[in-house]
């Protein structure tokens, strides 16, 4: 046995189905060899963590080799265009795990090539139906990423055991359609690094099997949200090459690594759980530190060694695919039963080392799990419930009072306006620096392979809970619907940082504080959709990332412009009758009649009896009602005020139609619950309505008591004169002053005023203080809820002030002169004319209400004269108070009776008539309808980022995935060495009697 010189490591082929166990007995373990010197090539990129195996027994520690120096990182590879999606293949049955071959001596490590660019993502899963979009808030800025911890140093490997013969190759399954990704689980910290066992004796290196054909990558479509990780399939036994001869003791060159055994196919994905209610999704928080590695699994029995294979050259990494759009989480597939294993392929020749590739961008962190065909796409999850309405803005100021009109019927609601422009998402937070990788320890010889681990049960659900929705804010003022904005461009993902060197395991860093919120971007236009790129090679599955912290609540959207004023509604119902108008003035008194001719002077006769009281005049016709005064401003509908002075309330103003709802603000993640804004200023009280039509006239006043009789003059009584003739009619006295206006009568039938126009809207109130929201739990994006019902109408305003009375109606035309009124109190007697020369006939006093005729006082004795003939009786003057009797003149010689003296001054005014009956109170106008609720105001300002919520529970297992396409047949393995003889088998049962054989040849003749 010479020392086998290892060739460079070739790229790993696709994982085949495990073959059934071979029939050979287990080989004997060779003596342990000395560990080889470690290679000095650069360390390659770290692969995704595999499923933890069972812990093997720790062997004796091998001597560690020198750590190789790490080469400089290559430049970042360009990002590939998304390829077209591949068709999902049928899923193959699961094969049995083959036994591993023993690993040969490790040779010195060759120079490590530069890491290739990451492969593109596979075909996306089917998107579930999109829910109605919720309102979108402004995204908060991502917090800074936490620093990555250092990886622990690897322990020495234990010695390998003998391997069994390889089984026949299994058929590769077709690639299944990628299932919908579930929510990304929180990344657990890695377990502690297992202790590497002491290296066993290296066997001869087996020849490497030929690399399988890589499956064609599907075109990456929209990236689905990460699904719940499926249950990992049991890994196949690692293959080991046959042990080489014992090398010389001391640090010799490292042997070639044996070909890995065919991996077991991935089990069917468990049934996909129903998606839970969606929470409010926040931006991802800072990345957590990488956990420690898990303990190493127990080694299984080693198979028989195979011939060493040559390493193939490294494959080129594909360009990373663009991130797809996250789809709703589909149900997990059910677990499938394992299929029979295929035979192990024969090792291929070692390939030459490939050139170092450029480092690719760091792939997205994937869910853990053994690689295998994905499960079938689950049915889309149920539609989410309606999203909660955003917090309303502060109430606007009450507008000025409009003209009060009659309430009209409620107008139809305006059409809702288009949604406002969508805001641009904020820039992503800065990526934290990656920790340096520690230097790798020396590779010891491989230990015996452990048995295949059982498939692990699905882990328990994480402790997260659905975030509770915050309370709704105060209702905002209706805004004018804005134009629908075009969606903003999706921000381009930032470049991934180069991977740092691997350092020693560092302590777990403390999570840094969340970064400040990024500024809100202006709404962008939708960018043109990029062409699909060529499919890239599948990328490695990364370890699951930590649960991100929920982002800050989006800032409040700006309030939309105030809606246009709605058209005036139709004329409202008749309002209550108005107050009585002012009573019309009394018509003028007719002109005086012509004076009679003077009669002969007669003797003064005795005082005649009082004349009869004139008939009561009929009430005059009512004047035309004056036009209603100008309408006052309508006040807002208020609570019923205290009834004012008795009068009929004015008609209520018609409420104008509500303006169309304002545009919806930009949708964003719901912000934190803001404090209720301060109420807006109270609107001014509206003026009272216009005065009502003139009421009916009040009842006629009652007749006043008669006036006092005049006192007799002081002169001595004169001689009784002869009854004179009727004197000439006196002149008509001046018109009496009009009576006072009576109390308002009952409501008149006047027309109602037209509805007043709405007053201008008041200024918006000041926004409320910024609320401090608790940090929400990261949830899945909810499907958009249906539109909420309009809010309840706001509370009624205070009652409006009573408006000023309307102006008096115009004076109506004088009515026709009515019949004479009731007789007034008798006037005082007129004074006699002075005796002597015959005076000119006195003028009649001004007519008043007809009163009793005053007694004539005795005049002073006049000079005796011839008795005059009685004068003719003058026509009765218009009824009016008789003037007071003048003082008696000085005594003179009795003369003939003088002519009738002038009428005395008008008597006192009669008592005011009784107040007419109070008119019935007018019907109260109904309160105006409450205005339609305005659209929600701008959302409140964003609250501070709340603490990270616990992880949500894991969903139930999904349905089984589709069968993968069968893999290519592997090459037949080399026959293993003949094992030791087995135990003796038991004697078999006697078989059935066979048919008689053919007759034999005749025997020799017998002895004579």
Swiss-Prot record:
UniProt biased composition (Pro residues): 159-171, 660-672, 813-823, 858-873, 993-1008
- Point to the regions of Gly residues compositional bias: 236-255, 309-318
Alphabetical GO biological process terms? blood vessel development; extracellular matrix organization; ossification; response to mechanical stimulus; skeletal system development; skin development
Instruction: Write down which residues bear the modification named 4-hydroxyproline.
Output: 18, 21, 23, 32, 35, 38, 52, 67, 73, 82, 88, 115, 118, 124, 133, 139, 160, 169, 172, 199, 202, 214, 220, 229, 235, 238, 260, 263, 275, 284, 299, 305, 314, 320, 338, 347, 353, 359, 368, 371, 380, 389, 395, 407, 416, 425, 428, 446, 463, 469, 475, 481, 487, 493, 505, 514, 523, 535, 538, 544, 550, 559, 577, 592, 598, 619, 625, 628, 637, 643, 661, 670, 679, 691, 697, 706, 717, 738, 747, 755, 764, 781, 790, 793, 799, 814, 820, 826, 835, 841, 861, 864, 867, 939, 942, 960, 975, 981, 996, 999, 1002, 1005, 1008
The record's tissue-specificity note reads: Expressed in bones.
Residues modified as 3-hydroxyproline: 705, 980, 995, 998, 1001
Pull one GO CC term from this UniProt entry.
cytoplasm
Which residue intervals are annotated with compositional bias (Low complexity) in the record? 105-121, 139-157, 205-235, 362-388, 397-416, 475-484, 519-547, 604-618, 631-658, 687-703, 731-740, 752-764, 825-840, 894-908, 942-975
Tell me, how does this one assemble?
Answer: Trimers of one alpha 2(I) and two alpha 1(I) chains.
Q: What PANTHER family does the record point to?
A: COLLAGEN ALPHA, COLLAGEN ALPHA-1(I) CHAIN
The miscellaneous comment for this protein is: These protein fragments were extracted from an ancient femur bone collected in Roseburgh, Oregon, USA.
Would you tell me the protein name for this molecule?
A: Collagen alpha-1(I) chain
The source organism is Paramylodon harlani (Harlan's ground sloth)
